[in-house]
Amino acid sequence: MATANSIIVLDDDDEDEAAAQPGPSHPPPNPASPQAEAPGSSQPHGAGGSSSSGGKKCYKLENEKLFEEFLELCKMQTADHPEVVPFLYNRQQRAHSLFLASAEFCNILSRVLSRAQSRPAKLYVYINELCTVLKAHSAKKKLNLAPAATSSEPSGNNPPTDPSSDPTNAETTASEAPRTRGSRRQIQRLEQLLALYVAEIRRLQEKELDLSELDDPDSTYLQEARLKRKLIRLFGRLCELKDCSSLTGRVIEQRIPYRGTRYPEVNRRIERLINKPGPDTFPDYGDVLRAVEKAAARHSLGLPRQQLQLMAQDAFRDVGIRLQERRHLDLIYNFGCHLTDDYRPGIDPALSDPALARRLRENRSLAMSRLDEVISKYAMMQDKSEEGERQKRRARLPQATSSHSTDPLKASLDSGEGPSGMASQECPTTSKPETDDEEDEESEEEEEEEEEEEEEEATDSEEEEDLEQMQEGQGDDEEEEEEEEEAGQDGDKSPMSPPRISTEKNLEPSKGISRSMGEQQNKEFTVSPSSEEPLAPSSIDAESNGENLEELLLEEESPISQLFELEIEALPLDTTPSPEERDISSSRKQSEEPLTTVLENGAAMVTSTSFNGGVSPHTWGDSCPPCKKSRKEKETGAEPLGNSYVERQRSVHEKNGRKIPTLPSPPSPLTSMAPVADSSTRVDSPSHGLVTSSLCSASQARLSQTPHSQPSRPGTYKMSVATQCDPEEIIVLSDSD
């Protein structure tokens, strides 16, 4: 009230002081009362109303002059953009006439003009400021000021621009005011109509539905459904008029986030598909497949066709389950009417009435079975229609391009025809048009993905460089180890070793050797099993027996004991072998470079197997397996393993009085790459060496039964330790022996 009284007092007191004010160049600080600051004029004023109208008229003339000066300045400074001046003029025409005749607009114009003249480089900044002010005071925004503006407009003494501006402003204000009043009336009418529909729906819900009305097209249930659809349309229209959101918080309106695949681009595309605005449409398998294909093509994922189909099938199942859950929850929350508002779970009559509960269960099972029948019926109909469409497409294919039509036909068959089977080629234009918002989102997503890809490429390149350096270091270490082994082997070669010759050139001497070895094995096969049993204790007395033990073992060792030793060698790594087995395995694993020999059946060679079951080109130097070593030989590990083994075998053969020429083989790359370990540690680290196989095979089992049978024809037997040594069989053999 104090502010209003002060304004009235200022209007009464300042009428006589208005003539003493200098002019519009020094306006008062209060723009709310522009009629109090009338510029100097020669006309006498008789009343306050005439002085206020004269002041507004003078402000309007001054504002028009200032605006024309600003437009002239803009024409000179914005010659490259001629659309600036018409834009400013249109903004000024749309502004309210009361604001155009105000001191506030005069202040803004004078300030903008002076700054634009002093700083021409910032002209567009001041143009933007003026446009913002004119837009804020446009006639559409200030509808309540329209009657005052029209009444305060003088009819005469207007510049030539007023007839073109004032009638348009009056027309716009006259058209806008009825529109606002009409929208208010429309809002009230829609609200009344909504209340009427709600009351009618409640009445129909309270009415009982007879079985005879089920087939009636105008039953109460159908009337209620029609009224509900109208109610939803009215509610949407009412939200548009009130400029508010139409969301009600239902479960079906909630957005479903999707993270089902490992590709975020595909996840975003599927999430947009299932959360598309509009009616709640359930996506088809073809829709999901098209979304996956578009995401893969747009972002160049490089996925094969089969993987895209599997991904689309998984996504379709996941999306379908989640949409069904959302619909089910929405039905639960919105099921019923005002009659069921007072329902509580504890007052269910089926809890106290077993007959009612049984009847409800029967009805539920019947409803589910009928629902499955309906779904299967229409699924079969859809499959038939799709099969017919595919046959039509095949018939349309031209006969001339039959040789080249295999790939397009396969593409048409595999282009999204899955469980529900909509082909991706049938409606290619349905998902092509996208909104501007989606394009903006995709552009932003592409930028983010490019940045992430650059970071990942940088990290991958660093990791690759580190791996290359590590591999180079390992390669250098292996080369050094190979050189050391070769140097050691060359230095320890004895002059008694025969020259290296291939087994193919020495087939004739090998036949004679095979005969002598066959006679020796025939002698060995006649040994009784009692002589085989003390084999294990003999290894314990190795210190006292010395070299005589080696001769005994060479003569008494049978193929069965050889097989047993082979199976002991192939035990798993986690087993702890006995001291006897350690002697056997250590003596065998010391042969890093074994020698080739000929079998009793005339075979050229028997290959050994590596630790993982692979066949290596190493061959034995004698038909008998390596003998057990004494502890003295174990302790002296200075000389290379291969040469010590060769010299030991030679000493045994010389004592027996036999001279068997050995055929050395070239060193294998596997043995050169394997590091040389001490004989005492070879059992603890079996992965560094080779697991060698003995000479016994399936043919030796037959020879043991018929010792004097004729030797079979020459052949090469390659046995794999990984295939013939089963842990279960090892346990059985060890128990039986």
Curated annotation (Swiss-Prot):
Residues modified as Phosphothreonine: T459
Protein's cellular compartments: Cytoplasm; Nucleus, Nucleoplasm; Nucleus, PML body; Nucleus, Nucleolus
Region (Sumo interaction motif (SIM)): 730-737
Modified residues (N6-acetyllysine): K511
GO molecular function: histone binding; nuclear androgen receptor binding; p53 binding; protein homodimerization activity; protein kinase activator activity; protein kinase binding; RNA polymerase II-specific DNA-binding transcription factor binding; transcription coactivator activity
Residue span of motif Nuclear localization signal: 390-394, 626-632
Assembly notes: Homomultimer. Interacts (via C-terminus) with TNFRSF6 (via death domain). Interacts with PAX5, SLC2A4/GLUT4, MAP3K5, TGFBR2, phosphorylated dimeric HSPB1/HSP27, CENPC, ETS1, sumoylated PML, UBE2I, MCRS1 and TP53. Interacts (via N-terminus) with HIPK2 and HIPK3. Interacts with HIPK1, which induces translocation from PML/POD/ND10 nuclear bodies to chromatin and enhances association with HDAC1. Interacts (non-phosphorylated) with PAX3, PAX7, DEK, HDAC1, HDAC2, HDAC3, acetylated histone H4 and histones H2A, H2B, H3, H3.3 and H4.
Protein name (Swiss-Prot/TrEMBL): Death domain-associated protein 6
